[in-house]
A protein has these predicted regions:
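N-terminal, Lys/Arg-enriched amphipathic/low-complexity engagement segments
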Residues: 1-43, 47
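Short, well-structured beta-strand-loop connectors
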Residues: 49-62, 81
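Short, Lys/Arg- and Gly-enriched loop/turn segments at beta-strand edges
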Residues: 63-73, 91
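Conserved hydrophobic positions within beta-strands
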Residues: 77-79
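Acidic low-complexity segments
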Residues: 86-143, 154, 210
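Internal alpha/beta scaffold segment
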Residues: 119, 176-215
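Gly-rich Lys/Arg/Thr-decorated short loops/hinges at beta-loop-alpha junctions or inter-strand turns
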Residues: 162-174
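Conserved small/polar residues in nucleotide/adenosyl-binding loops
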Residues: 216-223
């Protein structure tokens, strides 16, 4: 039998002073440093070089292995260099440095605010688009999402479980995202269900977020 944790443990005091503050758009910086290891697994491999012009949404690095993720530019401008930078953990990591110029976006990006609720893609096409987009989880590991959606052939998923539990006592971004973008999240859940070919999903929300619990209970169809 697997060992389990005994009942108890440490529950740090919550510090949610930023709760219920609206999400705001950050100002465009003069320079951007985009790490190539923003996820668990192998770092992404750069596909741009010094002097290349990039736009918002330009793919600048491709996955470096099966457990890896593509990376896209979040700014427009010119690649200044590819070098190492000391990250928040104190380790030198490879990164792409960009001198920001303007706010040009890739033409393939749909910037309209209309929410498309119907997905006509196959499960395989959905997984490929997720991989191409470099989507990763919001947890500390930033696990590449396409890997989660590709279980071994001998195993079949029974349901989708959405972990909407904030993983540390100061974090409030997930809570606010759930409140401001509930409809988009529910559409995303339905797309994930199609990707793994199941008809059931569960969303786990902490009991310290009664507003989110009420909101998603009202939006979720029940069997």
């Amino acid at each position: 039998m697997l060992k389990t944790f005994s009942i108890g443990g440490v529950h740090p005091h919550e510090n949610k002073l930023s709760a219920h503050q609206p999400i705001v758009q950050a100002e465009i910086p003069a320079k951007a440093v985009i790490l190539l290891g923003q996820h668990i697994g192998a770092p992404a491999k750069p596909i741009v070089a010094k002097g290349d012009v990039v736009k918002v949404g330009t793919k600048i690095a491709e996955p470096g292995g099966f457990v890896s993720a593509a990376i896209h530019s979040s700014v427009s401008g010119k690649v200044a260099k590819i070098d190492t930078v000391v990250d928040a953990s104190g380790y030198a990591k490879p990164a792409i440095f960009i001198d920001v110029e303007g706010d040009e976006w890739e033409e393939s990006i749909d910037r309209t605010e209309t929410l498309v609720k119907e997905c006509n893609l196959t499960a395989e096409e959905i997984v490929k688009k997720i991989a191409d987009a470099g989507i990763v989880g919001l947890g500390g590991a930033c696990f590449p999402t396409q890997v989660k959606l590709c279980p071994p052939p001998a195993f079949k998923a029974e349901c989708v479980i959405i972990n909407a539990v904030e993983c540390e006592p100061y974090l409030t971004a997930d809570h606010q995202l759930m409140l401001e973008h509930a409809e988009e999240i529910m559409v995303g859940v339905s797309i994930l269900m199609k990707a793994v070919k199941v008809n059931k999903a569960f969303i786990g929300i902490e009991n310290n977020k009664p507003d989110a619990c009420l909101l998603y209970t009202s939006q979720s169809p029940r069997d």
